[in-house]
Amino acid sequence: MLGQFIGSQKLPYKNVAVQLSKSCFGLTLIKSKRITPISTSRYEKHYSTTSVKYAIESELDSLVHSRNSNTIIKQSDVLPENIWRNYLKNNEIDKFTLHLLASLRGDDDFVKNLFKSGDLTYNELSIFINRIYKSNGHDIKRVIQNHHSLSYTELIYEIFELYTSTIPKESGIIKLNALHLKDLNLFITIFIKEAQLSKAQNVLQYIIDAEGSIEKITDHDTMVNFLRLRCGGLPKFWLVPQASYAVTKQTKKNSRLSSNSPNTRFPSSYKSTVPNTVLFEVINMILNKKVWKSKHSGILDSTIVYSLAHTFQKQMMDGFIKEHWGISSHGDPLDLFIKKKKVASAPSNEILIAIMSSYIYKDRNIDGAMKILDKFIRMYPDISLDNMFWRRLIQWCNRLWDPKIDRQGTFGYGCWNMMKNWNGAGTGKDVVLPYDFQIYEEFYRLFKRTNNGKIAAEIVSNVLIPHLSEKNVAVKKAELNLLNKYQTLAMNWLIERRQFKKAAFFIEEWSIDRNNRIQLREAFKKRKQLMLRKLSTRDKKSQSQKKRQDRYDEMEEEDMIIGRLW
């Protein structure tokens, strides 16, 4: 497959004949003589045994023979004038990637020559990296999924090495401009998404080495990634203590907030790797240096809060929040704060999530976080709480909920009522609950365990069916499964209360399509029959007990009569 992709394009191989072959993509490479692989770079030492360059070479070697090996054609007859721009124009990121990496096999200076000739510009290479990032590498993963010798993250690491080879040096010193920093931080983000933190650390270290030290860095994205990778500022990788009921032989006492998502990858370990003194110096620099005053953002401030929470710097975290937003975990909000600070806008949703999560993580309970959130809402009435906020809140509630201590799920239901009130409940207006798959997936665990079919029916009728029935919405299988879970919970709840007519009406009224209706009807019949058998068995037992009791009463009465006769 790799050969098919790159074989139809103009490759700068030495001593390679290109021959036409019938395949789904056109041409296939035919190897005629040995090709010397390029030399390894200073970063390749970490992956020398499984280098992607050798994997690509091996893959090409297995595809060198063609069915039509006698048909030789000229490269100029089939290749576009500028294949690289053609790839970008057609958004063929997979072909661009594999062609680029394969081209390096025969020419170490291939990319530099592309820039010299004008066939490719630095901006176009940056566009290529941005498109990999935005697409999450789906096209590349699809191409290499059947080739166990090729790894997506190692392919990306090869592109990183290639990219750094194009960065100019002055007197042997690397000079990074704004575009370089932007692209390099995209590499870091890609590796973080794939949970390849060692590769992300290598890219970050490359930037730090080029700049001299972390104290000399004034780039926003680089500082955010430094806090994430070396100061614990990545909450999705935090280990969260599980409630006792959730711990089984298959699960651990600690889990991660996003561990329910099948698409989320996790590193084997995650922790702060720098002394607290370094973290304090970095935060002090961000707060006090003039160059940073215009670079504050929700992402940067929230990452600082996460880092302080992960390193258990409670006092400094409280001080940072108080300095920025006038809210203290002790005492009332600072009433004069807004008057004193002319610019005191409400914190972003991202910051509120960070503050909430950090207090819960630090305290190992919900109380402190709820109290400080209440203070924020009172001081900043125009605060906006989006789906991500509610998702994170119910995730925390579920992780820390222990039904042995709290059978009613107090905090979980508190979260549910808070979300309803925030969206109009109690104001006389129609309640429009937000739709978010993960929110209701988390709530389902609460309602299922507490057997709350009433709220399940409310969610089906007010949230799930209205959203999934929209014409422009493409319904996913996971969403249909979640809908079926809520429908089944509501239906079974009605059946348990012997409200068979209401359960049947619910099915007819709130099924999304014919298949869903048939499925629910079958489940209804089975559940009803099971319920009737239980009732019948219960009645028989009751009648049997009544008969035994009657016989016992008769025997007692006879004994009393005989006793009087004697």
UniProtKB/Swiss-Prot annotation:
Example of a GO MF term: RNA binding
Alphabetized InterPro entries for the sequence: ATPase_expression_mit
Cell location: Mitochondrion
Superkingdom of the organism of origin: Eukaryota
Signal peptide: none
GO biological process, one term: regulation of translation
Protein name: ATPase expression protein 2, mitochondrial
